[in-house]
Amino acid sequence: MRLEGEVALVTGGGAGLGRAIVDRYVAEGARVAVLDKSAAGLEALRKLHGDAIVGVEGDVRSLDSHREAVARCVEAFGKLDCLVGNAGVWDYLTQLVDIPDDLISEAFEEMFEVNVKGYILAAKAALPALYQSKGSAIFTVSNAGFYPGGGGVLYTAGKHAVIGLIKQLAHEWGPRIRVNGIAPGGILGSDLRGLKSLDLQDKSISTFPLDDMLKSVLPTGRAATAEEYAGAYVFFATRGDTVPLTGSVLNFDGGMGVRGLFEASLGAQLDKHFG
């Protein structure tokens, strides 16, 4: 088990990608604190993982919630080795022209409060404990941090901001604490929700036909599941194999950046020779 004896705190760990990260960390021997707004999601984790989990119901927009999560993590497990900032919201590809004038400020504030400020607050709260453990922080980005079209104008701007945050924190905290990011593409089974300010709070990205949308444009030929993405979070949290790794963002999106102009990939031609 690659995380035996390690302790992590995962924000947004009650569903979707966050839940897959928590499940995988526990399977790899870690003990995990989870900050999530869903009491039901936290209870499901507790029933499944028992004493390996500490659940904290709270709001990632609140520094007090983050501080409570860190305090309860350290109280239960004695330390904090790895912060995983993962909680987020989506804008359902909403273009600037489609955001009403009277809602644009509110929508901007909601997006950046959760997707950017939420990470900054998590980092602020976790810093003393991470300094003591000489640990690391991992932040979920998105392929929207690299390319247009993975979200609308608000989501894409926010994810680009997160990449800047990762690089700046890696600079400010090195060499005591490593800071990195992971940028998934479309995630099958994700429960990422929309902005309340745009009346999208009851929509989930899981309703999108992601596999049909992505299989023709990704060199891998399909979208990946949350469980398939979770392994990268294990690697980034390990100590022995990641000593030189800080300020990096893994573009972990099925090869979107290497697709061709006319075809996503040419691997099918290999079948003519070797199939």
Curated annotation (Swiss-Prot):
Coiled-coil stretches are none
The active site is formed by 155 (proton acceptor)
Q: Which is one GO molecular function term here? A: oxidoreductase activity, acting on the CH-CH group of donors, NAD or NADP as acceptor
Among SUPFAM superfamilies, the record links this protein to: NAD(P)-binding Rossmann-fold domains
State where NAD(+) binds: 9-33
Enzyme Commission number, as recorded: 1.3.1.-
For the protein in the UniProt heading, the enzyme class is oxidoreductase
Q: Which UniProt keywords apply?
A: Aromatic hydrocarbons catabolism, NAD, Oxidoreductase
Biological processes, Gene Ontology terms: toluene catabolic process
Q: Which residues bind substrate?
A: 142
Out of the domains of life, which is the source? Bacteria
The pathway to which it is assigned is: Xenobiotic degradation; toluene degradation
NAD keyword on record? yes
Catalytic activity annotation: (1S,2R)-3-methylcyclohexa-3,5-diene-1,2-diol + NAD(+) = 3-methylcatechol + NADH + H(+)
Q: Which family does it belong to?
A: Belongs to the short-chain dehydrogenases/reductases (SDR) family.
What is this protein's record name? Cis-toluene dihydrodiol dehydrogenase
Q: Which organism is it from?
A: Pseudomonas putida (strain ATCC 700007 / DSM 6899 / JCM 31910 / BCRC 17059 / LMG 24140 / F1)
